Each structure stands twice: as C-alpha cells, then as structure tokens.
Amino acid sequence: MKSKAAVRRIVEELKVLYPNARCSLEYKKDYELLFAVRLSAQCTDARVNMVTPSLYQKFPTLEAFANATYEEVGDAIRSCGFYNTKSKDIVECAKILLEKYGGKVPGTMEELTARPGIGRKTANLILGDVYGQPAYVCDTHCIRITGRLGLTDGSKDPLSVEKQLRAILPPEESNDFCHRLVLFGRDRCTARKANCDSCPLRKDCDYGKAQK
C-alpha cells in the first residue's frame, strides 16, 4: 500500500502536468453527457465529438430522442459503431428520464446504473462532472496506470480498482485525478510503452522504479 505522502505527491504532480482536467467529451446538458458516454463505448472520444453536434441538432430535446425510432437515432450515430444497440439504449433512456425523473439525469449510483446501457464507469462520470460528487471513473487508462504506480494491486477488474482507489484517494481529488490519468495515459504512460525515463512520477511508481 502506498503511503499517504506518496499518494499526495502523485496527485499533486498530475495537477502540475494537467491543471485543467476535464472530460474530453463535449456536452451542454446533463443528458448529452450521458448519451455521449454511451456512444464512446468501443469508440474514441474524438469520433463521438464529431458526431454529437449533428445528433443534438437533429434531436434537440430529450422529448425528441424519446419520440424517435431506433433506426432514426441509429442512422445519426452509425460511425460510432454498435449503433443498433446504442440507439436503443439512448431512446429507452430518454423515455425513462422523462417518465421517472422529470427530464433530469438522476444523481445516485443506484438510479443511474438501473438505466439501459449505464454501468458504474458512466455513473461515476455523471456523478463527478454533473453533480460534483466524489467519483472514480475506472477506464482502461485508470486501471493500467494505477496498477503500474502501485496504487492498486494490479487488478484489471474495474470494481476492485474503484474500491482500492476509494480507500486511498482524497474524495475531493478523485474525479479530477481520474480525468488526469486519461490524459497521462494518452500522452506518456501508454499501453504499449510506459516511457519511464522521462516520467515525473517515477520516484513514486512501482513499475518505474523496477525499470533499469
């Protein structure tokens, strides 16, 4: 287990590297983030950001999504892949948000994960970015990098990683920390190469310290 001092150093160093941590998906309304995250499954954020402006122009309200057919939404998101499943989830989710929540995205883990196509990763992102709650978005970058750093035991299971991070991260730092790990994972600590020689986290990184 990392010392509190080591965890704090890692958190602070990432702040220096990425002071403006934010979700890379573009949105203006709470449900737009929810739908964008659904589209991002097996798709890049960059591609999603290319698709969503025209999607939200075609369906400018939650009611428009709820009244659309799966095929209509699917045609608008085709380039994001798996459009048949994603379009169904989006339309059904829009209906539920209107019928049960007055058109607002709910603000609890239990309510969010009960919706079609929403898992803990998406729910954490909504809780953190929309509601400002402590949130632990355990995507592939987070899982890989926290394992290399030694913040977790190296588990590849998102729920296990989330539980371990909840035990060591200051809650108020959690959401931005996970956003910064995404940027760090794209820029420096990639899946193919860790780039330890020039890494500012190396002194506190189990993987980095083991490299010669």
List each language-model region with its residue ranges.
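Catalytic cores of DNA base-excision repair glycosylases
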Residues: 2-212
